[in-house]
Regions:
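Pre-ATPase regulatory/linker segments immediately N-terminal to the P-loop/RecA-like helicase/translocase core
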Residues: 5-9, 70-194, 255, 261, ...
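N-terminal pre-P-loop "Q-motif" helix
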Residues: 181-201, 216, 295, 447
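A helicase ATPase "motif cassette" and its flanking acidic/Ser/Thr-rich regulatory loops
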Residues: 1-74, 98, 102
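Hydrophobic anchor at the beta1->P-loop junction of P-loop NTPases
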Residues: 205, 233
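Inter-Walker segment of RecA-like/P-loop motor cores
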Residues: 251-301
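Conserved helicase motor core of SF1/SF2 NTP-dependent helicases
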Residues: 226-229, 235-239, 298-589
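Conserved helix-turn-beta segment of the N-terminal RecA-like "Helicase ATP-binding" lobe
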Residues: 239-270, 484-493
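Walker A/P-loop NTP-binding motif
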Residues: 201, 214-229, 247-249
């Protein structure tokens, strides 16, 4: 399926076929993954090994000590807990993680006797076949009023393209009210908020990096709640849901009208409360007063069963597939989608990368000319760091805010350092590209790891706090190598707040300084991984996390390898264009 058909039955059949195909491929890949030895699963980031059982806490969670979590497993993830001497595995959830300890909440109650042998434990990511939930939503779609009158017309491009007279009037009132708040909002932010408040059916807000998308979302939710609406905030990930709800809760300022629904995980001083079921929450007794609930689309079946919403707000909609979005949209009649199709798209394993974008709800509705606004002022990127993404992803329309444009690195540059280090840390060089001549690196590069660690040490001793910098890399192996190198250069406590992770983990985050280590250089490997390495959306995310300085470490062979595919060559050219915008140096000089 590359685009939606204008025939409703074909739309639904295409989506149903995609759901079934995706579930089958996921099932096969998971079986192949679990057939691998533990050490290979650890390398892939799907397993955390060498767990040592310490205790059962008062909530029944098993608490384990570990040597460091280099996996992609995080709080809220479903896992299987296994032991090297046992075949059986236990289903559970990562309830909490702190430093070198991890809490596992079981599906069934743990018994102390299960942990007679304290060492030898490991956790793997779990697989759940959720296709029945998707198929159930698609089955309901053509037979219900919301499906027939609200959702299918959107997917088929039959919704009204402009505002009607009533919407126009409401838009003008909302816009004028925002304009009276002197200096609070940019023009396109006011347009987005007014559009969301006025529209009767659907509105899209595209939020390029650092443009205040979440701030706009929170204001919209507050105003909807103030006029008595029941609002659902949902997203593809728990992190995105929590982030959006926290921002909305700050705006609303009334804990009794805000609730998060889902299985309990550890919360850290949140400004909202969590409940397992709607009936347990204060929302159930709010009557006609507006409120906001936040949950995954899957929670609507049991935790929020029978609850009708006025407005469905989908955050990070660029990452949500259309079937998952439909599951949420069936619970309400108005849809506000916040996202950016130029950043990371949906996670899909059954289709080639270039087909995945069309499977996302944000991309699909943009193609159907749904009413939309693109926020065009970034508060994150300075003037130099804004130029490249603006020209290559946002039609030259993205510009830095007045306060962000002149922002530069302010830490002291050590005068005794090598010339290449001075160039790298120079405040007047916000974008730096460090050339390397290694030629045999795949998923890790010792040269780049050593240089990245040296730069971090220099920044740290120049006064930059660890939490103000991060390292982004395509491969977990490189992240591990950089951490190990840092362990030899700095006391462990001094860089605890430093994030070293993959692009996927950094979407939505920002730091003053970002190091991007691309590491790959072996020609055959670069060709094999070209779709992944040169993915424009991943590159856009990686290049737009920094507020004041982006430092890219890459082998010259990454850019000179001939790919013999016109599409991939275009994407390789995009990376070359980023290098052309940079101050270029080399640590081999």
């Amino acid at each position: 399926m590359t685009a939606f058909s204008l025939d409703a039955s074909t739309v639904i059949d295409d989506l149903r076929a995609f759901v079934c195909e995706e579930a089958e491929v996921q099932r096969i890949r998971y079986a192949e993954q679990m057939a691998l030895p533990i050490n290979e699963r650890v390398e892939k980031g799907t397993c955390l090994d060498r767990l040592y059982f310490t205790r059962l806490d008062q909530q029944g969670c098993a608490v384990f000590r570990h040597e460091g979590n280099d996996s992609r497993l995080r709080e809220g993830d479903m896992i299987t807990l296994g032991h090297r001497s046992q075949d059986a595995a236990v289903q559970g959830t990562i309830y909490r993680e702190e430093s070198k300890e991890i809490w596992i909440s079981p599906e069934r109650q743990f018994r102390t006797a299960q942990f007679d042998i304290p060492d030898g434990w490991f956790i793997d990511e779990a697989f759940m076949d959720l296709s029945s939930h998707y198929l159930d939503a698609l089955d309901r779609l053509p037979g219900c009023e919301i499906g027939q009158e609200r959702i299918l017309p959107l997917l088929m491009g039959e919704a009204e393209p402009g505002f009607n007279e009533d919407e126009d009037n409401e838009y003008n009132v909302a816009y004028d009210e925002l304009a009276s708040e002197t200096g609070s909002w940019e023009d396109m932010q006011m347009e987005a908020i007014a559009g969301c408040m006025a529209v009767d059916h659907c509105y899209l807000v595209q939020g390029p990096p650092g443009t205040g998308k979440t701030h706009v979302l929170a204001r919209v939710v507050r105003q909807l709640v103030e006029r008595g609406e029941r609002v659902l905030i949902t997203a593809f990930t728990h992190r995105a849901i929590d982030h959006a709800l926290s921002a909305a809760a700050r705006e609303i300022g009334d804990r009794q009208r805000v609730a998060r629904f889902g299985k309990a995980i550890h919360r850290r001083d949140e400004n909202y409360d969590q409940f397992e079921y709607y009936a347990e929450s204060p929302l159930a007794s709010c009557g006609a007063v507006g409120w906001v609930a936040a949950a995954t689309p899957f929670a609507l079946k049991k935790r929020l069963a029978g609850v009708d919403f006025d407005t469905i707000v989908i955050d990070e909609a660029g990452q949500m597939t259309t079937p998952l979005a439909i599951m949420a949209m069936l619970a309400g009649k108005k849809y506000l989608l916040f996202g950016d199709q130029q950043q990371l798209g949906p996670v899909v394993v059954s289709r080639p990368r270039r087909e995945i974008e069309s499977l996302g709800i944000f991309h699909a509705l943009r193609n159907q000319k749904t009413k939309s606004t693109m926020l065009d002022v970034t508060y994150r990127l300075n003037d130099v760091l804004t130029e490249w993404p603006s020209e290559n992803f946002y039609q030259g329309e993205l510009r830095p805010a007045a306060l962000a444009a002149p922002r530069r690195l302010t830490c002291r540059i050590p005068t005794e350092d090598l010339e290449c280090m001075k160039t790298t840390l120079d405040p007047q060089a916000p974008l730096v590209w460090i050339d390397f001549d290694h030629h045999s690196a795949r998923t890790e590069s010792e040269d780049e790891a050593c240089t990245a660690a040296e730069i971090i040490r220099a920044l740290y001793y120049s006064g930059l706090k660890p939490e103000e910098m991060a390292v982004v890399t395509p491969y977990r192996r490189q992240a591990r190598r950089i951490r190990r190198r840092l362990e030899t250069l700095l006391p462990s406590q001094s860089w605890r707040g430093l994030v070293i992770d993959t692009v996927e983990r950094m979407q939505g985050q920002e730091r003053d300084v970002i190091l991007l280590s691309l590491c790959a250089s072996e020609t055959s490997f670069v060709k094999q991984q070209a779709e992944f390495l040169f993915d424009p959306h991943r590159l856009n995310v990686a290049a737009t996390r920094a507020r004041v300085k982006l430092i890219i470490l890459a082998s010259e062979l990454l850019l000179s390898t001939a790919l013999y595919d016109s599409d991939l060559e275009e994407e390789q050219d995009l990376l070359r264009s980023l290098r052309k915008c940079a101050t270029i140096t080399s640590f081999s000089e």
